[in-house]
Regions:
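Formylglycine-dependent sulfatase
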Residues: 2-3, 15-178
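C-terminal segment of classical bacterial N-terminal signal peptides
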Residues: 8, 12-16
């Protein structure tokens, strides 16, 4: 079974009604996923039929190496195409960070929007916790997910209970769940 990951189906860049000349794009980034953890990449002990089906229908990128092996930096590199240090995103942000990926950076979702795509990000953002650094201000039409990882919240087993709750956001507001 896959380790408990903060399954980051974030960066699912989607298009609802695609022009046949343009493909739909779904980009999946998962923290701490090893090459042997998904069936389509050779996992024998872990069954991942849904991911395997997606891989069969699309393009599998087999050689993405993160610029730094931490959440924030790898996301920044994927979104910008730049080394994390170039965009000021080395290391990992936490719940007290008041900086993040500068909204003036040119990002993949901004480029896709310029070409008429609708964009969305689902999962962990981890590129800035204040509203002006949020996913909607970085080129995503929709965002539903966490601003940072659960190891920066009171739900993490080794952290003090006085840590703030980890909010689930819809856009820039705390999600109302029924």
């Amino acid at each position: 079974m896959l380790r408990p990951l903060l399954c980051w189906l974030s960066l699912s860049v989607c298009l609802a009604f695609a022009d046949p000349a343009r493909p739909n794009i779904v980009l999946i980034l998962v923290d701490d996923l090893g090459t042997g953890d998904v069936g389509c990449f050779g996992a024998k002990d872990i069954r991942t039929p849904h991911l395997d089906a997606l891989a069969k229908q699309g393009t599998r990128f087999t050689d993405f190496y993160v610029a730094q092996a931490v959440c924030t930096a790898s996301r920044a590199a994927l979104l910008t195409g730049c080394y994390p240090n170039r965009v000021g995103m080395q290391g990992a942000l936490n719940h007290t960070s008041r900086f993040g990926l500068n909204p003036t950076e040119w990002t993949l979702p901004k480029m896709l929007k310029d070409r008429g795509y609708a964009t969305a990000c689902f999962g962990k953002w981890h590129l800035g916790t204040v509203p002006e650094l949020s996913a909607p201000r970085q080129g995503f039409d929709e965002f539903f997910g966490l601003p940072y990882s659960n190891d920066n919240s009171k739900y993490h087993p080794t952290l003090a209970p006085e840590m703030p709750p980890l909010p689930l956001l819809e856009g820039e507001k705390v999600a109302e769940l029924d």
